[in-house]
Each structure stands twice: as structure tokens, then as C-alpha cells.
Design a protein with these regions (language model features):
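Short, well-ordered beta-strand segments enriched in hydrophobic/aromatic residues
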Residues: 37-41
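The feature marks proteins involved in alpha-glucan
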Residues: 1-36, 57-60, 65-102
Length: 102
């Protein structure tokens, strides 16, 4: 099965997790792709990442694409909105505000 059109190419994911991406704002955060809303996040140390709306409501789990903590997935949204994340690993959980939401 082919990746969706909005999937970030593997070399770009590698560039993000290694700190070499020339324009992380173009890749990370919430983006519209056709009729889909896509979110990408790099949360080092996270093994799981859940997207939260501005009120803290849990929206969806994001698939982890890179073990360093890169996550990407589509969201059931009708418009742009403020998002946060609930990150988890074996040591516990923590919340993250998406710094790329502008």
C-alpha cells in the first residue's frame, strides 16, 4: 500500500531528527493537504503521541515514523486550530504545546 500524498519523504524526516532540515516550519505542525489536515511533530524521547485540541480533548494517536520521536498523521478537523500533544514513554507522560502552529 502506498503512503498518502501528504506523507513527508523519508529524507526530510531524517533531516528533521538530525537537526539539518532547512525549513522545519514547512514540515512540522498542522498543514492542510487537499481535503486533509495533517500534523507532524518531533518530540524527542516520546514513544507515543496523542493529539489534543485547545481544551485538552484527545483527538487521535499519531503513528511514530522515526524512533527518535517523529510522528505524523491526519486529523479529523474542519479548520485550523490550536493543538497540543500528550507524549508518553516508559518513564511517564508529559504535555507539549506545538511550537509550529502559526
Amino acid at each position: 500500500m502506498a503512503d498518502p500524498d501528504w506523507t513527508l519523504p523519508a529524507p526530510e524526516v531524517e533531516a528533521i531528527v538530525s537537526g539539518r532540515h532547512g525549513d522545519p516550519f514547512a514540515a512540522l505542525g498542522l498543514h492542510q493537504s487537499g481535503n486533509d489536515w495533517v500534523v507532524r511533530a518531533f518530540v524527542p524521547g516520546a514513544e507515543e503521541l496523542e493529539v489534543l485540541d485547545k481544551d485538552g480533548k484527545r483527538l487521535v494517536w499519531l503513528p511514530r515514523r522515526h524512533q527518535a520521536g517523529f510522528f505524523e498523521g491526519s486529523l479529523p478537523l474542519s479548520n485550523r486550530q490550536t493543538l497540543g500533544y500528550l507524549a508518553r514513554n516508559a518513564g511517564g507522560s508529559w504535555t507539549v504545546t506545538d511550537p509550529y502552529l502559526f
